[in-house]
Structure formats: C-alpha cells, structure tokens
C-alpha cells in the first residue's frame, strides 16, 4: 500500500476566491441590513416610548435630551454590532481559507460601527423631529435615500453635463472634484473603498471610479473612498445627533 501525497493534496485543494467572495457577500449583506432595518428598529423604540409617555417625562427634565438621544443611539449600535459578533465564526473561517489577514475583520467591524452610527443618528433625528411615526419613517427613508442614491444620481448628472459641454469623454477637473465631493457624502463610499481594497479595486468599484474620472490605482482613491469618506460619515452622524438634541430641547420649551 502506497501513500500518494500528490493525490492527497489534489483531493483537498480548494479555490480561495470562493471563500474571499463568501466573506464579501456576508459583509455586504450585513451593511445592507443596517440601512434596511434601522428605521423599523428606531420606530419600535419611539412607539414604545410614546405609549409610556417617556418622551414627555424626559422633556420635563432639564438637560435630559442629550442623555436620551445618546442612550438611544448607543443601544441601537450595541444591537446591530451583535450582528457582526454573531457572524464572526463564519467570517473567521472565510479569512482563514481565503488567506485574508485578520485586520480585515477588524476593518469590517469598524465599517459596520460607522454605518450603524450614521444610520442610527438619522433615524433618531427623524423620530425626534416628527411626532407621527409614519412621517418620521418617511423622512428617515428620504434622508438616507438622498445621501445613498441622490449623491450617485448627482455625480451622473455632473458627468453627463461635463461630457455634453466639453464634447470629450474625459471629465473636466471641476467636474471630477464635484463628483469626489458628492461621493464623500455617500456613506457607502467608505464601504466601497473597503470592498475594493480586498478585491484589488476591481468590478463595480473600478467601473464607478472610471465613470467619474477617478483612477482607482492612486493614493487619492485610497484616501477618498476609505479614510475621508469614513470621517465624513462620522461627522454627519454627529451633526444629526446634535440636531436631534436641539429638536427635543425645542419641543420641551414649547
């Protein structure tokens, strides 16, 4: 009886790219669930608070608006980060078999934290601003759509206008700068940079960058679609939290 090491190795061979895309599919699904489920989660919180008249009680306590808003955002972040924690076993196996370094998992956790903070801040602001849950839900959906889809539509309009004016396929420098600015306002830009960083800036990411005149092989791409977009996302979340606190204090005075 002979031991054939070559046959053994062939029998246990696997395609690392399949595990790589398994990791990306799971992470993309998690990010998508944040934006889809967030309005429903916050709606449930505020519906319960209004039924128990907790909002009126908090409004009567000076300085409680800040504590209430921060507490709500913190609870929502904790709930959605459990989605990331629960997927760690599968994600870890995907990293092991695809050869991805462990820091990619850490980056995914940071991306989920940033996206959750951004979406939760907008949702808390919407439900603090509108007294009717259905109007708050509609406002929340409209604001998120404006930043996620509206910025993409704006870049496409700028691109088409630049091409029609110059008559060339390449965009004017001012058009490229405007497209970069609108891309920074899109919370998915940070995740798109994360996705492109893993896959080598290929596929949809490369196509999008090529259409708006951004070279995905430069350092500008790495800074714009990963670091700067994440910072802008955090700053927008802080701004919406400040607006929610201001709105609750305004309602308390009325």
Regions found by a protein language model. Give the residues of each.
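Long, hydrophobic alpha-helical segments
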Residues: 22-48, 52
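Short cytosolic juxtamembrane segments of multi-pass membrane proteins
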Residues: 248-254
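Terminal transmembrane helical anchor/hairpin motif
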Residues: 3-17, 149-239, 243
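Hydrophobic/aromatic residues in alpha-helical transmembrane segments
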Residues: 38-42, 90, 121-122, 244
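Hydrophobic alpha-helical transmembrane segments in multi-pass membrane proteins
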Residues: 1, 32, 75-92, 112, ...
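Helix-loop-helix units of permease transmembrane domains in multi-pass membrane transporters
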Residues: 43-81
């Amino acid at each position: 009886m002979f031991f054939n090491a070559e046959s053994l190795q062939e029998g246990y061979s696997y395609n690392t790219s399949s595990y790589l895309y398994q990791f990306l599919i799971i992470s993309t699904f998690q990010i998508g669930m944040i934006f889809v489920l967030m309005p429903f989660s916050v709606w449930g919180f505020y519906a319960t608070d209004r039924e128990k008249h907790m909002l009126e009680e908090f409004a009567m306590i000076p300085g409680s608006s800040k504590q209430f808003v921060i507490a709500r955002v913190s609870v929502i972040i904790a709930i959605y980060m459990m989605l990331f924690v629960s997927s760690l076993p599968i994600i870890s196996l995907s990293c092991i078999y695809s050869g991805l370094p462990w820091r990619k998992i850490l980056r995914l956790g940071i991306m989920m934290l940033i996206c959750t903070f951004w979406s939760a801040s907008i949702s808390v602001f919407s439900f603090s601003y509108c007294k009717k849950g259905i109007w708050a839900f509609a406002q929340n959906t409209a604001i998120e759509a404006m930043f996620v889809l509206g910025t993409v539509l704006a870049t496409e309009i700028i691109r088409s206008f630049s091409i029609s004016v110059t008559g060339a396929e390449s965009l004017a420098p001012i058009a490229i700068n405007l497209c970069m600015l609108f891309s920074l306002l899109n919370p998915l830009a940070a995740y798109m940079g994360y996705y492109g960083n893993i896959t080598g800036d290929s596929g949809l990411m490369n196509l999008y960058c090529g259409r708006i005149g951004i070279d995905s092989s430069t350092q500008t791409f790495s800074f714009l679609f990963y670091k700067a977009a994440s910072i802008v996302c955090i700053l927008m979340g802080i701004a919406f939290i400040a607006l929610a606190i201001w709105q609750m204090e305004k309602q308390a005075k009325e």
